Amino acid sequence: MFSYLRQPKGFYRRLFLLALPIIVQNLITTSLGFLDTFMVGLLGSEQMSAVTVANVPIFIIQLIVFGLQSGSSVLISQYWGRGDRESINRVIGIGLCIAGSVSTLFALIMAFFPADVLLLVTDNLRLVAIGTPYIRIVGFSYILNSLSSIYIGMQRSIENPRFGMLVFGASMLCNTVGNYVLIFGKLGFPALGVTGAAAATLLSRVVEFALAFGYALRCRTVPLQWSALLRPGREMLRRFIHYSAPVLANETLWGVGYSLITVIMGHMAASGDLIAAYTVAGSIDKLSTAGIYGIANAAAVIVGKEIGIGSSRESGVRIGKAVCLTAFLFALALGGVELLAFFTLLRPYVLPLFSLSAGAAAMCAVMVYCYAGVMPLHGFSSTMVVGVLRGGGDVRASLLIDNFPLWCMELPLMCLLGLVLKVPNEMFCLCIAIEHLAKTPVGLLRIHSGKWVHDITRSE
């Protein structure tokens, strides 16, 4: 039954060697993001909720960029297996152009109409007032972040995930130090509060971009070919749109859907407490899921390269099944660790530091239990969508599997329970488990079918 787990010697070592730098990168980013939330939370739960609301449109930008990054990786990982560096440059050029244009448009909208953007998320005018200066500044930081993220994604796709780990580590360290200095007014700087958090984010993105651009100029593995970067050609643009558009649509729809969860919460009773609980529980969960996305991204590189070098469909299916089961078991252990850490460390010692109300703390606990309970399914579904299906070029199926449960099941149920029936908030929190419960059986059928294996570098 599990014969597919018998892979060639060194397969699992290669998987975890690729995943480890990505996991470390995710842990650094998430841990320092948790510290970021913690430092803003020290100003008060109202300030923390305002920043969470302000980050909803930022989250959409991040998801669009991640979609472009992932869509580029679908092509790059297979071109890497083929050894076609010129085509890799063409893909990067298209990704940089689109990412830079989209992030600039968002930044301008948030700079000139910040309050209008925030009013789309919440009707709490106090949160809008606090979040307006934050969103006006932080929007520009994601122009630089979008460009560096596309390049870092390329390096990950050519089996160099360590680069992203180092760049994001330096960036997030800069962000944490900047937060401490600018939020609380240390080292002679004025205490800027929420505005200081935005300024620190902008500074960290400048550092991130400078490191990525400097490395790109010196990289010899895939050296920059300016003619290919600036003139990628119509054929490559057609292929990029064909394979990347569904991934971009996937991440955009998923990002908008997840942002609507915050919007729904923002229009419920006790919205401030509910959003604060969601922010803290989500930060805790992201620490655990850092490992899941490390496995998923490593799987995308391995699957894509395997198909790119011309391996058989059967070989691709065996690898897909092996990495999905590995992710499921790994996530099962992560869920146990999350619960143990919450009971022994976070709940008694860390949560009180956030100054949450009793109701918010109770809702936070319910959310953490739900996140930990579905962690194994989260591991399987994320690796199946981000790693296996995308790595295999099956981008349309991954679009449907990733978004149908969220848009057609989870969000309607949340609207019904939270806005119509107005159930207790603790009961509403249980809805966050629905998405992964629904994805798993459909994903299993798709993986076993083998219809997801497509050699997109030879499909001209």
Where are these regions (language model features)?
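Small-residue-rich hydrophobic transmembrane alpha-helices
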Residues: M48-L108, N145-G164, I275-A341, L346, ...
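Transmembrane helical elements of multi-pass membrane transporters/channels
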Residues: L17-G33, I137, S171, S204-E208, ...
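Alpha-helical transmembrane segments of multipass membrane proteins
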Residues: F34-F38, L108, I150-M154, V177-F184, ...
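Short runs within selected transmembrane alpha-helices of multi-pass transporters and secretion channels
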Residues: Q69, S73, V138-R156, G164-N175, ...
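Short alpha-helical transmembrane segments in multi-pass integral membrane proteins
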Residues: M1-A19, I76-I143, C174, F189-S244, ...
